[in-house]
Curated annotation (Swiss-Prot):
Binding-site residues for D-glyceraldehyde 3-phosphate, renumbered to this chain: 219-221, 250, 265, 278-279, 301
Annotated catalytic residues: 220 (nucleophile)
One BP annotation, GO: glucose metabolic process
Name of the protein described by the UniProt record: Glyceraldehyde-3-phosphate dehydrogenase A, chloroplastic
Organism: Zea mays (Maize)
Molecular function in Gene Ontology: glyceraldehyde-3-phosphate dehydrogenase (NAD+) (phosphorylating) activity; glyceraldehyde-3-phosphate dehydrogenase (NADP+) (phosphorylating) activity; NAD binding; NADP binding
Length: 403
């Protein structure tokens, strides 16, 4: 049985350069909406971060030496981002990543972890160890390769939690194969299908039920949308609305025109704006049930590799002004949504939000109110890095309330 370990630090989640330095990029402390962190702040901030999500982190326990044994299934964009984010938390993390399932093998896993076209070169010593492991700053992580989760050696390795990052095993039957293989719990890094409980850190993760063996971290877009929608609904009352996410292309699209079940995603991703579906708006009701049936939306996939932006338009029941809407966001960002929500007052563009640790950054200058009851909000998010930080946070919550 694994126990949890929490840091007593009081530094908010996203303050200054922080974890972007672990990604191989220059520090994002230069972004004007963030203060410059001291080195002490930085080490505190990366040591452990779920303390900064209001009540979502659950009760704290004293630090112990035992850690949750974690395996990553699928070492693609989210799997590798997750490992970098976890590595950035340092020794204070209650997680211990001990295994990766990747069909590409050891050489490919180590190379793609070290060298990343979006994140840059990983500031860690990464190398293969024989034919079945990689080393990250001396930490040896076993690499296995099997497309069928039922065959994975999770029982033999004593795996407590599987980070399911393939995007394939998202229902109880599929994710349950990890439990059949000996793992105790599964965290899906995608919207779950069926009745799988969905949690968004900062929104409803305080309701986490440790008796559930399979949970979902929702989608990157839901993680961006839900925090500020929660603020809007609490302060002004949402009647109905629509959302458009202008979303960077993903691995589910085609580099050149080729077959795909979605005829639009079949078209060349780097050459087109690709309208497609998203369940993010409807999925908000999974974490904010009072909004069921009130939101819907679409996605526009665009030729950028990372960072996306949500455009939400809602009708509200309480008359308001743009300044009041932004102030509500500022208040939440300074309190219960510290480290989850930020407000930016500078005219930035998508690349400026690369490796942003938060789930959602409101572009304050673009907030509009038409009449007195139609509100338009624009919010940026790093759909890979920011989302992966929340996966680590939710895994930390699992560790904190392990049973």
């Amino acid at each position: 049985m694994a126990s949890s370990m929490l840091s007593a630090t009081t530094v908010p989640l996203q303050q200054g350069g922080g974890l972007s330095e672990f990604s191989g990029l220059r520090s994002s402390a230069s972004l004007p909406m963030r203060r410059n962190a001291t080195s002490d702040d930085f080490m505190s901030a990366v040591s452990f971060r779920t303390h900064a999500v209001g009540t979502s982190g659950g009760p704290r326990r004293a630090p112990t030496e035992a850690k949750l044994k974690v395996a990553i299934n699928g070492f693609g964009r989210i799997g590798r981002n997750f490992l970098r984010c976890w590595h950035g938390r340092g020794d204070a993390s209650p997680l211990d990543v001990i295994a990766i399932n990747d069909t590409g093998g050891v050489k490919q896993a180590s190379h793609l972890l070290k060298y990343d076209s979006t994140l840059g070169i990983f500031d860690a010593d990464v190398k293969p160890v024989g034919d079945n492991a990689i080393s990250v700053d001396g930490k040896v992580i076993k690499v296995v390769s099997d497309r069928n989760p039922s065959n994975l050696p999770w029982g033999e390795l004593g795996i407590d939690l599987v980070i399911e990052g393939t995007g394939v095993f998202v229902d109880r039957e599929g994710a349950g194969k990890h439990i059949q293989a000996g793992a105790k719990k599964v965290l899906i890094t995608a919207p779950g299908k069926g009745d799988i409980p969905t949690y968004v850190v900062g929104v409803n993760a305080d309701q986490y039920n440790p008796d559930e063996p399979i949970i979902s971290n929702a989608s990157c877009t839901t993680n961006c949308l839900a925090p500020f929608v929660k603020v809007l609904d609490q302060k002004f009352g949402i009647i109905k609305g629509t959302m458009t996410t202008t979303h960077s292309y993903t691995g589910d699209q085609r580099l050149l025109d080729a077959s795909h079940r979605d005829l639009r995603r079949a078209r060349a991703a780097a050459l087109n704006i690709v309208p497609t579906s998203t369940g993010a708006a409807k999925a908000v009701s999974l974490v904010l049930p009072n909004l069921k049936g009130k939101l819907n939306g679409i996605a526009l996939r665009v030729p950028t590799p990372n960072v996306s932006v949500v455009d939400l338009v809602v009708q509200v029941s309480k008359k308001t002004l743009a300044e009041e809407v932004n102030q509500a966001f500022r208040d939440a960002a300074a309190n219960e949504l510290t480290g989850i929500l930020e407000v930016c007052d500078v005219p930035l563009v998508s690349v400026d939000f690369r490796c942003s640790d938060v789930s959602s950054t409101i572009d304050a200058s673009l907030t509009m109110v038409m009449g007195d009851d139609m509100v338009k909000v624009i919010s940026w998010y790093d759909n890979e890095w920011g989302y992966s930080q929340r996966v680590v946070d939710l895994a930390d919550i699992c560790a904190n309330q392990w049973k």
